[in-house]
């Protein structure tokens, strides 16, 4: 770290009017790419390439500054779409929903924000969600977020929707402006210290601070009134709380003292709205809103400090290059030397790192949404709980595969082996054979042993020998490490965390269950032999996914089979004619194969979650305090055999979607059917080769010529890689939509 203050330097960071705005240029298909613009637009292949390469900025130009500007501009377009989407969500809440009714009775009324038009009899889909409202039950969690943020009327949702539209148009304008009018120079994109300072202090610091401010001044008082049963129409409007301190002081007396306790360090005065309670609010079943406000204030302070750590114009603070180059251990050669150059000149390397982090974070979010439900009445809305978990797991899986994809693109396009010697990346590449062969051994070990435990149980069960099965009732395989972690956390309050009154999550154990309106919100989750078995399946599928993706990255440039692989590019079908056995070796193919195993991994996780929660957590509680779970605790006995998974999970729980015809859930029945079809359609692309289709196309074209109806654009069979891409897309889309229909029909019917 350097501490010396010199005169601040002023740099010119933008070019004015670098590229003129031309509608004629935009109208020319493929104008952005040399290859496509020169190509032959008379074939369907050209159309496919147009779509495949439209966003592959590397293939349009080799100029890093131009690529950076395109990416930057595209980000604004992406933000515009996000604002447009959000606006649509809020508009639906304002125009087509029962939000105000739900707000008055969230335990008995389901959230709905979509009403189907009465055409061809499809109004059957508008089921009764309670309170006399007929519509489609939604499971996105928007109602819960809106209540937590203090929205009390549909008018407020309208205003927010209009605001989001204004922001969407602003983002579109910014995307055009920062490409055509004031485009940043390459140096601006590479100024990582400035970027870190602004992102940490601005986005995360001030963002969290403003959210904390909103929660304290608007959300908390409004939620206080709602929890007390005050009619939403009687509650003062948000701006009244902000402008009139006396209103807040009536709810939180310390507000009357203003900032005095802050400056006199008498901070405990603020504990009534910046609390540290832990656990769940017994009225709403969500985390305490005052805990959440406290959390965002603390996070804001951390990030505001972090955003002042890096050296920019004033010659004081950390430099990223120095930190990375100092990062060497006794056994790691040059360590991170050269990493700074990689991350400031290869956006693929940068993106890969960010996708890996974001993907992991997204999966962590999935697990926190049920174990620490952040919004009021979220925990008892089982459909939303299941949807949020499933959604965040899928998103996390895709992001992690994306991380491997861009790591491989970096290796092929941006990695320069001549300048890298003995740094960490080089050392990993030099012992890649050891890494991959060991990982392969681990996959084989995990696969045979985890599956073997199930097969043993199926065999013993089939032969009528329950006493010889691995189960909680016979040969126990208790997950002792997981139980140990649970116990540590359950016992933490008063021992390792003396300030806390309760553990971070009820799932650890130790606490009483929380029930809202006769429904279980959360209770301690027991783990047993069944969980031990399925967790080893998780370990197996995750390790295989990693094996495929990591092999793709480490062998992206070369292998014993194809030493010059880097020259063939990121995606290629085979190493040319005359070299048999070299197909499916490109880095792209590893991403393709990795996607299937990612799908396997996430499927097992969401199946496990869905069944475990229905069996051991979700359910109703009687006046006598007796809990009745949805599937009556059958997970521990049934999920220990493959047959049990098929019979008591897939088949038994599919009854709702299969029998949905003629009811308001029938759309899920149709989706279940249609998505199976989309999935099966993918196999047509995955199981047949290019030549088969070219032959077929030629005879179809002959017939068209005979009838003089041949198109001007020549049809061509998909290339091998395009066929695989279309195949994996439909495979995943069909599989995910099938699961979605199965889960939602089930949980809406029984939850």
Swiss-Prot record:
Catalytic activity: reduced [plastocyanin] + hnu + oxidized [2Fe-2S]-[ferredoxin] = oxidized [plastocyanin] + reduced [2Fe-2S]-[ferredoxin]
Listed InterPro entries: PSI_PsaA, PSI_PsaA/B, PSI_PsaA/B_CS, PSI_PsaA/B_sf
Residues bound to chlorophyll a': 676
Molecular function (Gene Ontology), one example: chlorophyll binding
Cofactor descriptive note: P700 is a chlorophyll a/chlorophyll a' dimer, A0 is one or more chlorophyll a, A1 is one or both phylloquinones and FX is a shared 4Fe-4S iron-sulfur center.
Coiled coil regions in record: none
Biological process annotations from GO: photosynthesis
Binding-site residues, [4Fe-4S] cluster: 574, 583
Chain sites annotated for binding chlorophyll a: 684, 692
Residues the record lists as binding phylloquinone: 693
Membrane topology: Multi-pass membrane protein
E.C. numbers: 1.97.1.12
Subcellular location: Plastid, Chloroplast thylakoid membrane
Presence of the UniProt keyword DNA-binding in the record: no
Transmembrane residue ranges: 71-94, 157-180, 196-220, 292-310, 347-370, 386-412, 434-456, 532-550, 590-611, 665-687, 725-745
GO cellular component, one term: chloroplast thylakoid membrane
This protein's UniProt keywords: 4Fe-4S, Chlorophyll, Chloroplast, Chromophore, Electron transport, Iron, Iron-sulfur, Magnesium, Membrane, Metal-binding, Oxidoreductase, Photosynthesis, Photosystem I, Plastid, Thylakoid, Transmembrane, Transmembrane helix, Transport
Subunit record text: The PsaA/B heterodimer binds the P700 chlorophyll special pair and subsequent electron acceptors. PSI consists of a core antenna complex that captures photons, and an electron transfer chain that converts photonic excitation into a charge separation. The eukaryotic PSI reaction center is composed of at least 11 subunits.
Annotated family: Belongs to the PsaA/PsaB family.
Function summary: PsaA and PsaB bind P700, the primary electron donor of photosystem I (PSI), as well as the electron acceptors A0, A1 and FX. PSI is a plastocyanin-ferredoxin oxidoreductase, converting photonic excitation into a charge separation, which transfers an electron from the donor P700 chlorophyll pair to the spectroscopically characterized acceptors A0, A1, FX, FA and FB in turn. Oxidized P700 is reduced on the lumenal side of the thylakoid membrane by plastocyanin.
PANTHER family reported in the protein's UniProt record: OUTER MEMBRANE PROTEIN, OMPA-RELATED (PTHR30128), PHOTOSYSTEM I P700 CHLOROPHYLL A APOPROTEIN A1-RELATED (PTHR30128:SF19)
Protein name from the UniProt record: Photosystem I P700 chlorophyll a apoprotein A1
Classification of source organism: Eukaryota, Viridiplantae, Streptophyta, Embryophyta, Tracheophyta
Gene: psaA
């Amino acid at each position: 770290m350097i501490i010396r203050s010199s005169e601040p330097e002023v740099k010119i960071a933008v070019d004015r009017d670098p590229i003129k705005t031309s509608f004629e240029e935009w109208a020319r298909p493929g104008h952005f790419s040399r290859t496509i613009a020169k190509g032959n637009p008379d074939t369907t292949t050209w159309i496919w390439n147009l779509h495949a390469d439209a966003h592959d900025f590397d293939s349009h130009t080799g100029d890093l500054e131009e690529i950076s500007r395109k990416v930057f501009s595209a980000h604004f377009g992406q933000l515009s779409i996000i604002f447009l989407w959000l606006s649509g969500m809020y508009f639906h809440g304002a125009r087509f929903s029962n939000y105000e009714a739900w707000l008055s009775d969230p335990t008995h009324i389901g959230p709905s924000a979509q009403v189907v038009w009465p055409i061809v009899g499809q109004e059957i889909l508008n089921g009764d969600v309670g309170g006399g409202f007929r519509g489609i039950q939604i499971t996105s969690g928007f109602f819960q977020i809106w209540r937590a943020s203090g929205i009390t009327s549909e008018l407020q949702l309208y205003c927010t929707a209009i605001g989001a539209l204004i922001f969407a148009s602003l983002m579109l304008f910014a995307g055009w402006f920062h490409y055509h009018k004031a485009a940043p120079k390459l140096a601006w994109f590479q100024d990582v210290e400035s970027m870190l300072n602004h992102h940490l202090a601005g986005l995360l610091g001030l963002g969290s601070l403003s959210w904390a401010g909103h929660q304290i001044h608007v959300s908390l008082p409004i939620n206080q009134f709602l929890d007390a049963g005050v009619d939403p129409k009687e509650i003062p409007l948000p701006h009244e709380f902000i402008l009139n301190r006396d209103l807040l002081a009536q709810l939180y007396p310390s507000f009357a003292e203003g900032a005095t306790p802050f400056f006199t360090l008498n901070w405990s005065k603020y504990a009534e709205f910046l609390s540290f309670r832990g656990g769940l609010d017994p009225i709403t079943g969500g985390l305490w809103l005052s805990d959440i406000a406290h959390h965002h204030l603390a996070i804001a302070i951390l990030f505001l400090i972090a955003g002042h750590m890096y050296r920019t114009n004033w010659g004081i603070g950390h430099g990223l290059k120095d930190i990375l180059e100092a990062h060497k251990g006794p056994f790691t050669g040059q360590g991170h030397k050269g990493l700074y150059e990689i991350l400031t000149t290869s956006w693929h390397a940068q993106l890969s790192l960010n996708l890996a982090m974001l993907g992991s974070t997204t999966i962590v979010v999935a697990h926190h949404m049920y174990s620490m439900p952040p919004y009021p009445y979220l925990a008892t809305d089982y459909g939303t709980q299941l949807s949020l978990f499933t959604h965040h797991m899928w998103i996390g899986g895709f992001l992690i595969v994306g991380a491997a994809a861009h790591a491989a693109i970096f290796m092929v396009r941006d990695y320069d082996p001549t300048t890298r010697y003995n740094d960490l990346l080089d050392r990993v590449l030099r012992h890649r054979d050891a890494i991959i062969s060991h990982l392969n051994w681990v996959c084989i070990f995990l696969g045979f042993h985890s599956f073997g435990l199930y097969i043993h149980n199926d065999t013993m069960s089939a032969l009528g020998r329950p006493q010889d099965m691995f189960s909680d009732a016979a040969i126990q395989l208790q997950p002792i490490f997981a139980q140990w972690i649970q116990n540590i956390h359950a016992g933490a309050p008063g021992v390792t965390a003396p300030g806390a009154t309760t553990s971070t999550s009820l799932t650890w154990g130790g606490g009483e269950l929380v029930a809202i309106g006769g429904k279980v919100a959360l209770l301690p989750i027991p783990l047993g032999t069944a969980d031990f078995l399925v967790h080893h399946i998780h370990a197996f599928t995750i390790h295989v996914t990693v094996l495929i993706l990591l092999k793709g990255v480490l062998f992206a440039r070369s292998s014993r089979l194809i030493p010059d692989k880097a020259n063939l590019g990121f995606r290629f079908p085979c190493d040319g004619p005359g070299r048999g056995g070299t197909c499916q070796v490109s880095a792209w193919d590893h991403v393709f194969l990795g996607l299937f195993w990612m799908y396997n991994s996430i499927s097992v996780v969401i199946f496990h979650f869905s069944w475990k929660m229905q069996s051991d957590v979700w359910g109703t509680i009687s006046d006598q305090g007796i809990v009745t779970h949805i599937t009556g605790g059958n997970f521990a006995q049934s999920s220990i055999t493959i047959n049990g998974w098929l019979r008591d999970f897939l088949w038994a729980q599919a009854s709702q979607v299969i029998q949905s015809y003629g009811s308001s859930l029938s759309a899920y029945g149709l989706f279940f059917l249609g998505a199976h079809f989309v999935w099966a359609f993918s196999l047509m692309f995955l199981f047949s080769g290019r030549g088969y289709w070219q032959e077929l196309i030629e005879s179809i074209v002959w017939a068209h010529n005979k009838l003089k109806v041949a198109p001007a654009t020549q049809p061509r069979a998909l290339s091998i890689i395009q066929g695989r891409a279309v195949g994996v897309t439909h495979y995943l889309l069909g599989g995910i939509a099938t699961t979605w229909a199965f889960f939602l029909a089930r949980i809406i019917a029984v939850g």
